[in-house]
């Protein structure tokens, strides 16, 4: 298929979360390659870089599910966004499915399942990137927030529906199940046009039983990583263990803080979230820098001897792990996380059983028992897959050729 136009669908018109960053950065890169790119989004603000790069923006100007003050209207719209459906049909009508491809990154927060019905109705080939598990699991993570543990239920089975796993309450879990039923119906009806790509081998394996029900083709499409600096970090004189990410229970931030405190290690946390104030009060020994970018971020990264990625749920990948490895910083990662495929134990990092705090503590001790110069030498010879934006675009264009 000779692709001329690409319509990118994403909940937000700016960078919000990992999926949003990929949607935004890839849209800019595709436009720079000469494609006519349309960015279809619902929730603002819209980043001015889009139009500055010649990207056409379709903006619905709607609040997302969490910030909308009218919770009932928001809940209904989150199941079926009528405006998104209507405007998507209008947008698609301006292009031909013979030379135009749809790329979907985020739809759960605002756009809803309605957009998939428009792709089927207008017969557009759709590349759906599986940044999370929402195409199968009602809460998007195969994670029981009540038990703070990985969930083993088959998604949308009777056992799943009857299990209170939601971070809020069981009524909200039932609402999620209704939303999931609508999404499943829309996806299955659009199966002829959907090509679904997971962001890691683990993600692809977990979603395979579900993806076969709604996608005509599937595979793995690795996300590109941000090249913050081309220089490698010299860890030989560094002392800090680093955490990068949201400060939420499921990300394992408490495990990070606890282990560096108990072992009397230096800790740096880059990220924000609802736990920030409590963590600052509870762990005054740890540096909490919030979200930082550019030279400020590089300054903190240069202090790191190791990244701890203590997530308690099955992350589809873990971009921060790939980014730190690319800069020469070893990582400690739990088994069952997508980024674990990048780790060669005792070479560029260590692994432990997900959710096992004692296992994490053993791994951190083991890391410290090895001379830092030895870790540095091992990191200097590591071979990582090429996760540059150029490689990502090449893989996307290869997919275009198979449509």
Locate the predicted segments by residue.
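Short acidic/histidine- and often glycine-rich active-site loop of Leloir-type glycosyltransferases
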Residues: 336-346, 350-351
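Conserved donor-binding/catalytic core segment of Leloir-type glycosyltransferases
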Residues: 225, 234-251, 257-262
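Carbohydrate-associated surface elements
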Residues: 202, 224
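Nucleotide-activated donor-binding/catalytic signature segment of Leloir-type glycosyltransferases, i.e.
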Residues: 277-299
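Membrane-proximal helix-turn-helix segments that form the acceptor-binding/catalytic region
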Residues: 121, 134, 146-196
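A charged, aromatic-enriched C-terminal amphipathic alpha-helix characteristic of glycosyltransferases
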Residues: 371-401
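Short hydrophobic beta-strand element within catalytic cores of glycosyltransferases
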Residues: 330-333
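N-terminal strand-loop element at the rim of the active site
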Residues: 33-82, 91, 273
């Amino acid at each position: 298929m000779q692709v001329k136009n690409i319509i990118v669908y994403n909940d937000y018109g700016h960078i919000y979360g990992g999926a949003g960053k990929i949607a935004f950065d890839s849209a800019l890169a595709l436009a720079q390659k000469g494609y006519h790119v349309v960015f279809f989004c619902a929730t603002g603000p819209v980043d001015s870089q889009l139009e500055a790069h010649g990207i056409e923006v379709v903006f619905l100007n709607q609040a997302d599910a969490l910030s909308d003050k009218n919770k009932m209207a928001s809940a209904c719209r989150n199941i079926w966004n009528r405006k998104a459906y209507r405007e998507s049909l209008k947008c698609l009508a301006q292009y031909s499915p013979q030379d135009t491809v749809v790329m979907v990154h985020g739809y759960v927060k605002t756009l809803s399942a309605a957009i998939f019905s428009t792709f089927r109705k207008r017969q557009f080939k759709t590349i759906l990137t599986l940044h999370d598990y929402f195409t199968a699991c009602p809460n998007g993570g195969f994670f029981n927030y009540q038990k703070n543990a990985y969930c083993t239920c088959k998604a949308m089975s009777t056992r799943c529906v009857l299990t209170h796993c939601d971070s809020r309450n069981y009524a909200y879990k039932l609402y999620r199940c209704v939303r999931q039923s609508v999404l499943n119906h829309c996806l299955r009806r659009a199966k002829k046009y959907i090509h679904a790509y997971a962001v890691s081998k683990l993600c692809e394996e977990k979603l395979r039983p579900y993806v076969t029900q709604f996608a005509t083709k599937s595979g793995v499409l690795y996300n590109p990583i941000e090249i913050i600096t081309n220089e490698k970090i010299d860890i030989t004189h560094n002392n800090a263990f680093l955490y990068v990410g949201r400060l939420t229970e499921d990300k394992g931030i408490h495990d990070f803080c606890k282990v560096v405190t108990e072992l009397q290690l230096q800790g740096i946390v880059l990220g924000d979230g609802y736990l920030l104030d409590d963590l600052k009060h509870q762990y005054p020994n740890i540096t909490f820098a919030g979200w930082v970018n550019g030279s400020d971020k590089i300054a903190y990264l240069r202090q790191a001897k190791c990244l701890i990625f203590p997530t308690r749920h099955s992350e589809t990948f873990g971009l921060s792990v790939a980014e730190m490895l690319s800069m020469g910083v070893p990582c400690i990662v739990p088994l069952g996380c997508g980024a674990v495929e990048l780790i060669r134990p005792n070479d560029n990092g260590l692994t432990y059983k997900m959710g096992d705090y004692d296992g994490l503590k053993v791994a951190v001790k083991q890391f410290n028992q090895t001379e830092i110069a030895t870790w540095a030498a091992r990191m200097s010879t590591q071979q990582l897959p090429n996760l540059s934006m150029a490689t990502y675009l090449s893989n996307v264009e290869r997919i275009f050729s198979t449509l």
